[in-house]
């Protein structure tokens, strides 16, 4: 029996509709209505350091030799011990510190400087795979062996990145998203240590090396920069989805190699400088 062109067209159209319906069923968004969401019992945001360092992907940027590694080492030791830092509670648990620019001898010297007692639940590595070669699996394996892991610090982020020249927003964002997904999967804090750009910027949070895709994909970002208020100090600028914006004035104690708090804008909001003054100081500083 001959089939007319109109019938063939109708049959073809029906097949396409069935195929598209099947595809669309698989591509539907997974959604939840507001009423159901409000009735769900969800875990509150967890913190490695209460109100300061949330679970998820965090990034700490700072100029070379300013003291980022000293700060991260102190954080990891205190989390492993369950000791407060700057009067903020820590969640006690295993800490992993990938010191990829250091040797074990240097780490030992620094530990001797900052503490009299090194806890057994802080672990160090001086080499690791790149992200494209299996870093995430290495961290997964460590957390599997140490289920109480609270923090994994990577110092520095640049060492584990892909070895290419792509510094676009899309590439930066995607790399950070991979590590954020890992932090969310393992329910830990991953803290990346990163460098700042050489050129100045009136907004400290725009100084991270690379595009804004790096800070944009992170749960929290911290910039340790030369203080605009004191000659021998530093300011830690903090911002994130689950923390309040704050500026913490710090002083480096050369005797015990620890960063000590001078003031905190969360407790004393009046110490925040107006944006115009901040921009002027930054301009003058980078002209010197």
Label the predicted regions.
Residues 26-29, 35, 43-44, 48-49, ...:
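Conserved inter-motif catalytic segment of the P-loop NTP-binding fold
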Residues 54-58, 93:
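Pre-Walker A (Motif I) flank of P-loop NTPase domains
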Residues 59-61, 65, 69-70, 98, ...:
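Phosphate-binding/switch region of NTP-binding enzymes
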Residues 71, 75:
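Hydrophobic positions on the alpha1 helix immediately C-terminal to the Walker A/P-loop
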């Amino acid at each position: 029996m001959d089939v007319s062109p109109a019938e063939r067209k109708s049959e073809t159209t029906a097949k396409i509709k069935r195929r598209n319906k099947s595809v669309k069923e698989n591509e539907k968004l997974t959604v939840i209505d507001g009423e159901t969401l409000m009735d769900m019992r969800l875990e509150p945001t967890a913190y490695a350091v209460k109100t300061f360092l949330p679970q998820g992907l965090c990034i700490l940027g700072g100029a070379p030799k300013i003291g980022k590694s000293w700060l991260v080492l102190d954080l990891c030791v205190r989390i492993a011990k369950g000791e407060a830092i700057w009067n903020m509670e820590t969640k006690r648990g295993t800490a992993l510190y990938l010191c990829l620019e250091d040797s074990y001898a240097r780490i030992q010297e620094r530990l001797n400087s900052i503490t009299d007692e090194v806890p057994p639940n802080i672990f160090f590595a001086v080499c690791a795979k790149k992200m494209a070669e299996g870093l995430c699996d290495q961290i997964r394996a460590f957390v599997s062996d140490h289920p109480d892991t609270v923090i994994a610090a990577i110092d520095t982020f640049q060492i584990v990145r892909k070895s290419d020249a792509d510094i676009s927003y899309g590439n930066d964002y995607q790399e950070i998203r991979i590590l954020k997904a890992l932090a969310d999967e393992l329910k830990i804090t991953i803290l990346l240590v990163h460098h700042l750009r050489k050129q100045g910027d009136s907004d400290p949070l725009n100084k991270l090396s690379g595009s804004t895709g790096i800070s944009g994909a992170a749960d929290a970002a911290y910039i340790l920069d030369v203080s605009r208020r004191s000659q021998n100090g530093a300011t830690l600028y903090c911002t994130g989805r689950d923390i309040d914006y704050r500026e913490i004035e710090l002083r480096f104690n050369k005797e015990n190699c620890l960063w000590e708090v001078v003031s905190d804008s969360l407790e004393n909001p009046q110490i925040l400088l107006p944006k115009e003054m901040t921009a002027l100081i930054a301009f003058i500083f980078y002209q010197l």
